[in-house]
Amino acid sequence: VVIHLAAQAGVRYSLENPHAYVESNLVGFANVLEACRHAHTPHLVYASTSSAYGANTRMPFSEHHGADHPLQFYAATKRGGEALSHSYAALFSLPTTCLRFFTVYGPWGRPDMAALKFADAIAHGRAIEVYGHGRMSRDFTYVADVVEAVTRLLPLAPTGQPVHAHDTLSPAAPWRVVNSAGGAPVALDLFI
């Protein structure tokens, strides 16, 4: 089993250096896919992002919603990774689960993420920069919940065959997308 969590992350930096995202998130991931293909990996778990939903306005986000209009380079490269992994699943029977993580926070989190930026500002008595008057909502996911999602999915490699009559998460290729979220969007002003 291979768990691929490495990536060039972050929306803002992708605007400054899109090549870093292409190299890491597409070229780097293509190298992982090739290695998994040749090693006959029984299950690849790939860290994707809720940003893949892009311009989708249907809430709550569902794996069945379109993800064909990413709005940033970061999201486009992660969505591209999903497409690459689907091709490998279809062509080489590489069982792959793409996990779309939603705003992960917790210990050792990225310093550019809202939770750590807010905590740092509060700890140092600085004002918190809030966009949209704090009314926008995010589905924040604690890092331990991400670990649990990955751990639970490890033994459940997609087969390419529907598990039951209403299963649309297991297409003909042994590949699937699974949302990994807290399950309860929180308004930013309440989160702060």
Task: List the predicted regions and their residue ranges.
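Alpha-helical substrate-binding/gating segment
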Residues: 90, 116-128, 138-178
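Glycine-rich "substrate-gating" loop/helix at the edge of Rossmann-like oxidoreductase active sites
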Residues: 71-74, 101-112, 132-144, 182-184
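Catalytic helix-loop patch of NAD(P)-dependent Rossmann-fold dehydrogenases
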Residues: 16-34, 38, 42-43, 52-98, ...
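SDR active-site strand-loop-helix element
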Residues: 2-8, 44-50, 99-101
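Small-residue (primarily alanine) positions within well-ordered alpha-helices
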Residues: 6-7, 35-36, 47, 81, ...
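Active-site loop of short-chain dehydrogenase/reductase
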Residues: 40-44, 48, 56, 93-95, ...
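NAD(P)H-binding glycine-rich loop region in Rossmannoid oxidoreductase-like domains
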Residues: 1-24
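Non-catalytic, hydrophobic alpha-helical segments
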Residues: 2, 146, 150, 180, ...
